[in-house]
Amino acid sequence: MGLGARGAWAALLLGTLQVLALLGAAHESAAMAASANIENSGLPHNSSANSTETLQHVPSDHTNETSNSTVKPPTSVASDSSNTTVTTMKPTAASNTTTPGMVSTNMTSTTLKSTPKTTSVSQNTSQISTSTMTVTHNSSVTSAASSVTITTTMHSEAKKGSKFDTGSFVGGIVLTLGVLSILYIGCKMYYSRRGIRYRTIDEHDAII
């Protein structure tokens, strides 16, 4: 490869690097302007009277990963309790910035290349980077068991006297006679067959 080709490749590489640098600077300026607007809109609502400011510098290449793949927003977070924490971050490169409200702003990004400046404001001389407030509601459930008494009144007709049922009496007699007649006929048929068998055996013996 000649010197001319190498020079062309070097010039192309330098031009690419310059273009990337210009794009990065433009993106950085846009992100800084957006963060400045967010600070101007958020900080007046979340200031306190007697506050101490503590500056904390974070390294430039910083990646924030949460369970929902979200990065802590460059806004000010304030709570109503005595401990007030305000966190301000100035990123240089960000993407997909969503500002749902004045108090909390979620900025989704994969990698942040920034030089954030964290300001912690505390009233009770306690510096907190992330404040978590847990509210526990203790509810007691009282179940009242009500007893319901149902009184059922059954009016039964008083039996004046036992009446003689002629139909059931006659039916019982007919049923008894029917069973006896069936037994009689069965026994008679059994004995008649038995007598025929004995008689045939006697005749056979007599013939022999």
UniProtKB/Swiss-Prot annotation:
GO cellular component term of the entry, any: external side of plasma membrane
Side Cytoplasmic, residues: 188-208
Residues passing through the membrane, by range: 167-187
Composition bias type Low complexity, residue spans: 108-122
Region listing for Disordered, in residue ranges: 42-125
Keyword terms: Glycoprotein, Membrane, Receptor, Signal, Transmembrane, Transmembrane helix
Signal peptide region: 1-26
A GO molecular function held by the record: signaling receptor activity
Glycosylation site positions: 46, 50, 64, 68, 83, 96, 106, 124, 138
Tissue-by-tissue expression: Ubiquitous. Not expressed in ovary. Expressed in keratinocytes.
Cysteines paired by S-S bonds: none
Topology feature Extracellular, residues: 27-166
Localization in the cell: Membrane
Membrane topology: Single-pass type I membrane protein
Compositional bias per record (Polar residues), positions renumbered to this chain: 42-57, 65-107
Family: Belongs to the CD164 family.
Function per UniProt: Implicated in oncotic cell death, characterized by cell swelling, organelle swelling, vacuolization and increased membrane permeability.
UniProt name for this protein: Porimin
Organism: Homo sapiens (Human)
